[in-house]
Amino acid sequence: MHFHFSKMHGLGNDFMVVDCITQNVFFSPELIRRLADRHTGVGFDQLLVVEAPYDPESDFHYRIFNADGSEVEQCGNGARCFARFVRMKGLTNKYTIHVSTKKGKMVLNVEEEDLITVNMGVPEFEPNKIPFRAKQSEKTYILRVGEHTLFCGAVSMGNPHVVTVVDDIRTAAVETLGPLLESHERFPERVNAGFMQVVSRDEINLRVYERGAGETQACGSGACAAVAVGILQGLLDEQVRVHLPGGELEIHWQGPGKPLYMTGPATHIYDGQISC
């Protein structure tokens, strides 16, 4: 099997992006794991697949696979790269692009060729829709994680997130708590774990341990989840700058029931082709 691809990143969260409209490529979990290997493959956090639309209201269907081969519902940084890719490859000339995903629909707005605003949809706090095992929706939950007791927020941005407020992002125990939270029994589909330091009401520092990928340089849906939880808990205002290890995102949310918007860069690194 031989196919063309692009390597892209959103704030260091890196992707292999493949057009499966003009190419016929099948990605098995084993093949994805081989391609994701940074020593013997292409190397990436996620594989993004562009498919023909599943319904007449969408321009494309957007699929996301983690480096471990698992398919996931959402990737905000990937969505920005997806928008740049389909324009760069001549698959569309639209500036507003409608895509379907495993979990729903998204709208991608191209502000400039490398600056994209994504309508991430309405944050979902109902436990059974995250999914998260809890009797009722709360702003803050208490989780036992190993020897630790954590006060967390839980939300779905199309994929499940748990967010913990920390005093200093530099000393947060992301390496140890991240994998424990990811596989916590109260999250039946596993979860992305965010560690948020509130700098001010319009600024946070954030690290994210991603489900199936580990800690990444940036996580767009994680940034959205952190801001949504912070606003719900009364810690943040509606316009927030998020500092991640790989760079900055701007998040805007007017509160429960309203869609959340994320603005950030999408960077093309190179084009390649591979036989496997």
Curated annotation (Swiss-Prot):
Where exactly is the site Important for dimerization?
A: Y270
The positions flagged as active site in the entry are C75, C219
UniProt-listed Pfam families: DAP_epimerase
> Where does this protein act, in terms of pathway?
Amino-acid biosynthesis; L-lysine biosynthesis via DAP pathway; DL-2,6-diaminopimelate from LL-2,6-diaminopimelate: step 1/1
EC numbers listed for it are 5.1.1.7
Question: What are the entry keywords?
Answer: Amino-acid biosynthesis, Cytoplasm, Isomerase, Lysine biosynthesis
Q: Where does substrate bind?
A: N13, Q46, N66, G76, N77, N159, N192, E210, R211, G220, S221
Q: Top-level EC class, please?
A: isomerase
As for subcellular location, the record says: Cytoplasm
Give one GO molecular function term. Answer: diaminopimelate epimerase activity
Q: Which residues form a coiled coil?
A: none
The positions annotated as site (Could be important to modulate the pK values of the two catalytic cysteine residues) read: H161, E210
Q: Which GO terms describe its biological process?
A: lysine biosynthetic process via diaminopimelate
What catalytic activity does the UniProt entry give for this protein?
Answer: (2S,6S)-2,6-diaminopimelate = meso-2,6-diaminopimelate
The record's Gene Ontology cellular component field reads: cytosol
Biological role stated in the UniProt entry: Catalyzes the stereoinversion of LL-2,6-diaminopimelate (L,L-DAP) to meso-diaminopimelate (meso-DAP), a precursor of L-lysine and an essential component of the bacterial peptidoglycan.
What family is reported? Answer: Belongs to the diaminopimelate epimerase family.
Q: Which PANTHER family match?
A: DIAMINOPIMELATE EPIMERASE, DIAMINOPIMELATE EPIMERASE, CHLOROPLASTIC
Q: Per its UniProt record, what HAMAP family does this chain match?
A: DAP_epimerase
Complex and partners: Homodimer.
Q: Per its record, how is this protein called by name?
A: Diaminopimelate epimerase
**Species this protein is from:** Vibrio cholerae serotype O1 (strain ATCC 39315 / El Tor Inaba N16961)
- Supply the gene name: dapF
